């Protein structure tokens, strides 16, 4: 760790403390140091985790927070060195004026982002394009996120959104609680995971993307459950209780109960008022119960909501087209 000088603690992530630090070999480079707290501290870092994380260093995409380095210290400590961004989507939404559905909170100290960016329709579309393109890139490399939420969507000084923590779930698992014993949020978790499914795929990230989309539009979480069953019921109350006709195989999930209340589906237009028709169509495609029919990131990039293609709105057209 001699190459890094910690400046301050900036947060407590799912896996451990996050520091703002200076890279001493490049004195002008500020980085985020994520200290990964491993379950079995005495056993050292599992080689599988090191392998998984090493693969993430190769993930280079403008929509992904860049993993710059992996530092293995004292045998059982692991630090991940990421590019530094001081703002996340949760804080960004909270900083919006109360008149725009935010809480008028101050941006983090030293945040260089202009306060007047707001979160109007065009900004939501841009953030969605960047989010979906980032997910598409990761899925094309067979990497899932599994824990997408506004807290790990970071925003740079130019008002561009980048995905953080991609691939960490596979390396370290998704804990039920953070290392400080805070409960990991369930608000963005897909129904197949909540119902105890063991086999899941890229659709889990697309569901999270839908919940985040709705929250950007309304400034309120769509399914703010405070336990697994409350989360399931919050979903059922809005989207209706699924059955075999809507979601073939749903009754076979380990945690599905035939005694679940039978709620009718709400009109999505009433849930997210003001969202344009193509946006509502994309939202419904993201919040499709059946993961086999849920829209993929690749399909979402070409959805009519992004009339000119997602790269037009993300502002991040790639030289060599899509991966």
From Swiss-Prot:
GO biological process, one term: positive regulation of mitotic cell cycle phase transition
Domain Protein kinase, residue spans: 4-306
Signal sequence residues: none
InterPro entries listed in its UniProt record: CDK, Kinase-like_dom_sf, Prot_kinase_dom, Protein_kinase_ATP_BS, Ser/Thr_kinase_AS
Quaternary structure annotation from Swiss-Prot or TrEMBL: Forms a stable but non-covalent complex with a regulatory subunit (SUC1) and with a cyclin.
Entry's family note: Belongs to the protein kinase superfamily. CMGC Ser/Thr protein kinase family. CDC2/CDKX subfamily.
PANTHER family registered for this protein in UniProt: CELL DIVISION PROTEIN KINASE (PTHR24056), CYCLIN-DEPENDENT KINASE 2 (PTHR24056:SF254)
UniProt name for this protein: Cyclin-dependent kinase 1
Lineage: Eukaryota, Fungi, Dikarya, Ascomycota, Pezizomycotina
Gene for this chain: nimX
